[in-house]
Design a protein with these regions (language model features):
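Membrane-water interface of transmembrane alpha-helices
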Residues: 108-121, 191-194
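Perimembrane loop-to-helix junctions flanking transmembrane segments
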Residues: 62-83
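Metalloprotease/metallohydrolase-associated module, dominated by Zn2+-dependent proteases
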Residues: 2-60, 125-220
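Active-site recognition of the HExxH zinc-binding catalytic motif
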Residues: 98-115, 149
Length: 220
């Protein structure tokens, strides 16, 4: 008789949060609804692309899009051909610069509040990040931390739509679309924070595990 043994790889345990501070309830795991956020990001992208595209059209006129499309007239028809080289390079630049600046702005506000910031890239998740691991963050601080990139980049990039250099204006348009769409997770956190009591604390154990500590003396 041949005895066969199979080694079962143990499941990865969820990292434990610290003990609750005095006056706080037991921690609750905070999770992002990944599928919901992905679905929400689609109409957000379309709305943002149309909105900023309309603004760019109003400021620059239709000729600005000549940097994106090659126009060919054949008989009674006009054919628009997307130039992938002229579009692809500004898009890649806009993507990486926007993501990097987005996270640097998160980190800058964290540092303003005296938190130690860790920057990094998680290839498995396909994400850049700025995080204050192993530190309590107050609910009131997380509002500016979460909204700083969305607001700052919008303020900085929107005026560039009026620059009379099509490549700059179009790149600014891409930055605005990428940044706004990519802020869907930040907007979700802010929406959740609005429903939490004042004084709530959040604690990042690692990139995937965030815990919420709510105060015990909450008035109903």
């Amino acid at each position: 008789m041949v005895e066969m043994k199979f080694a079962v790889r143990p499941e990865r345990e969820t990292p434990s949060p610290p003990a609750p501070p005095a006056g706080y309830d037991e921690p609750k795991l905070f999770e992002y609804p990944t599928l919901v956020l992905l679905l929400v990001s689609v109409p957000l992208f379309l709305l943002t692309a149309y909105g900023f595209g309309w603004l760019l059209w109003q400021i620059q006129g239709p000729e600005v899009f000549a940097t994106l499309f090659a126009v060919t007239e054949t008989g009674d028809s006009t054919v628009l051909v997307l130039d992938m080289i002229d579009v692809g390079l500004p898009f890649v630049v806009a993507l990486f610069v926007t993501v990097a600046v987005h996270e640097l702005l998160h980190g800058a506000v964290m540092r303003y509040y005296g938190q130690d910031v860790t920057y990094g890239v998680n290839l498995a998740m396909g994400a850049f990040y700025a995080a204050a691991f192993g530190q309590f963050q107050r609910r009131e601080q997380l509002f500016p931390i979460g909204l700083a990139p969305l607001v700052s980049i919008a303020i900085g990039a929107t005026p560039l739509l009026a620059v009379p250099v099509p490549s700059i204006a179009v790149t600014a348009y891409m930055v605005l679309v990428i940044n706004t769409t990519g802020a869907v997770g930040d907007l979700y956190v802010v929406w959740c924070l609005r429903r939490m009591p004042e004084g709530t604390l959040m604690y990042d154990v690692d990139l995937r595990h965030m815990y919420v500590f709510e105060p015990l003396d909450v008035e109903v």
